[in-house]
Amino acid sequence: MKKLLIASLLFGTTTTVFAAPFVAKDIRVDGVQGDLEQQIRASLPVRAGQRVTDNDVANIVRSLFVSGRFDDVKAHQEGDVLVVSVVAKSIISDVKIKGNSVIPTEALKQNLDANGFKVGDVLIREKLNEFAKSVKEHYASVGRYNATVEPIVNTLPNNRAEILIQINEDDKAKLASLTFKGNESVSSSTLQEQMELQPDSWWKLWGNKFEGAQFEKDLQAIRDYYLNNGYAKAQITKTDVQLNDEKTKVNVTIDVNEGLQYDLRSARIIGNLGGMSAELEPLLSALHLNDTFRRSDIADVENAIKAKLGERGYGNTTVNSVPDFDDANKTLAITFVVDAGRRLTVRQLRFEGNTVSADSTLRQEMRQQEGTWYNSQLVELGKIRLDRTGFFETVENRIDPINGSNDEVDVVYKVKERNTGSINFGIGYGTESGISYQTSIKQDNFLGTGAAVSIAGTKNDYGTSVNLGYTEPYFTKDGVSLGGNIFFENYDNSKSDTSSNYKRTTYGSNVTLGFPVNENNSYYVGLGHTYNKISNFALEYNRNLYIQSMKFKGNGIKTNDFDFSFGWNYNSLNRGYFPTKGVKASLGGRVTIPGSDNKYYKLSADVQGFYPLDRDHRWVVSAKASAGYANGFGNKRLPFYQTYTAGGIGSLRGFAYGSIGPNAIYAEHGNGTFNKISSDVIGGNAITTASAELIVPTPFVSDKSQNTVRTSLFVDAASVWNTKWKSDKNGLESKVLKDLPDYGKSSRIRASTGVGFQWQSPIGPLVFSYAKPIKKYENDDVEQFQFSIGGSF
């Protein structure tokens, strides 16, 4: 009986003490009904008709109370009936969150779920209050000191409850003042320049809101400034953050102890060097001896030592930099104390987070092999190659030790996949060209194999095109790729505002093989076939020169062409998805081969580079240039439908697609005299484009989401010309020539400037651009605003 009483006290219950064991002819459960009542009955250690003891009652009370589903549990005897009485906690039937914008609803719901507040869980009010308190503390950490978080519980019938988290985020507190103390050598203005947070001023639009996390980053920036300018002993000794009574303004005081400014007099490497002393010693040449000490240089050498040893299998190397100060001469010496550790073997390569991409697809990008010495360079190269596929938002790698082994590890790549399938719809509007539409369905990682499958189509007032494409990047184990396209186009250019009049039907196919040379270089070769049927074309001067060279008769053209394509590609981009560093370049060509009706060739060159301006790659300069040249051979001219034009996203924003190039010259009334100058674009056989962009942090977007959006300020330029114009124009009358520009001049450049925005949204890629021409010519078709929208799968 004493044991039963103790159990009752421990569990906060009251239990009637039985005088003696008895046979329970019936068992009654009070306080609940339905499924919960049946669950309690099923959990009882006794059944009706069985003998009940004090120990049985204690077990009943203990097991029900420990389940966490009840606020109170009692058990007692009423005659020959065992009565179990409970007060059940509410079951959560719904969870709602209102008033939040800074913290995403999804993030709050994930935290609620993790803390036991999802639908179907037992409601524990104390824990709910603790959760609300932690959210309020988070708001305070980001400068929203007046934010309120109120958990509201609405009790419903049948022991159910709804939870509402009502949030009022309020505004961030402003940094009212910033004061430095103890800085005798470095001015307060210089220290303030190192910080993102700045005191409030009437002209400041952002940067004046106080945020704890940013304040910590700024303090580290101040430390880095001192350490990289010789103040090796500099410390921030105290920070004082004072709120006003309304919690709307913050006054900050930062105390520093600068110490002396040192020069670096010498450096050496000692310790367990894994037998690589000769390879490590040259790394010290990166240091600037007898010059101002810079902690960043020391960190670079530390990383270089780890990387060099990592290439030989020492994946757990530790490097400690020990300074030896000479205060009298204001110099210091650095000793790099190295422990290479054990040489490691890679047991397995493992992948996490790839729910769509097959492991075998990711393994194709690996350079580190299982069962070989660990090589940090090859492991990092695998990460870079995964990034370049464009299949992933983020790629991280780590090494996991193996239980029971001190020289084996697993290399783990953790990826976050992005939507690689898309259904895109594009639309553009021009002052003269009107509305045009483009649609495409593309899957860059088909069934997780890495293969790309696409169906693309364009529909506008003057035509339709369809292209089916397939690329297998892992056609062979050696990395040879196989790609191909089947295409169909049907255009009535007489309805186009920017192209010379004719009707064209085209279909064909091509196949391409790509061969890797090394990690950054590859080349390709391909074969293709194209059939063209052209009719209803008006008599136009440039077109007539082509027809004469081909000796066509009548008002119809049919050609069958076979071509050989070739090219070289270079890629050192850090990732395929919104790159911030590296270069991508290509040279290519295509030439018709024997058996073709036409005889012509086309050459192209493209290069694009990304150059980060800061360590976090938030500010990036991007430059892009391209050139193309085409011509006929064997006394045949370049087909007029193979000429170049510019305009639109990808070549010259701010101008309508395909609207830039030499114009058509028609024969008026079909009399054979070419004297009607048109605004229709016939194109040229040479083109150059150039673009410079400053990629900037997107305003009002959190740091976490910056990698899904891209904002840039750009300048575009392009020129399209006819290199044979000097001889071509001889067939025109002088009165026509005087009204024509010199189409042979490459200096007839168009240019525009504007702002671009890209967003990899949950529904797919969104691209917007607004550009204003800064150099244009008469009759140019301006299209300032362009955008495309899409949906992903």
From Swiss-Prot:
All residue ranges annotated as the POTRA domain in the record: 22-89, 90-170, 173-259, 262-341, 344-418
Keywords noted in UniProt: Cell outer membrane, Membrane, Repeat, Signal, Transmembrane, Transmembrane beta strand
Xref: NCBIfam families: OM_YaeT
Summary of the function given for this chain in its UniProt record: Part of the outer membrane protein assembly complex, which is involved in assembly and insertion of beta-barrel proteins into the outer membrane.
Signal peptide: 1-19
Subcellular location: Cell outer membrane
Record note on quaternary structure: Part of the Bam complex.
Protein name: Outer membrane protein assembly factor BamA
GO biological process, one term: Gram-negative-bacterium-type cell outer membrane assembly
Pfam families registered for this protein in UniProt: Omp85 (PF01103), POTRA (PF07244)
Family the entry assigns: Belongs to the BamA family.
GO CC term (a single one): Bam protein complex
Domain of life: Bacteria
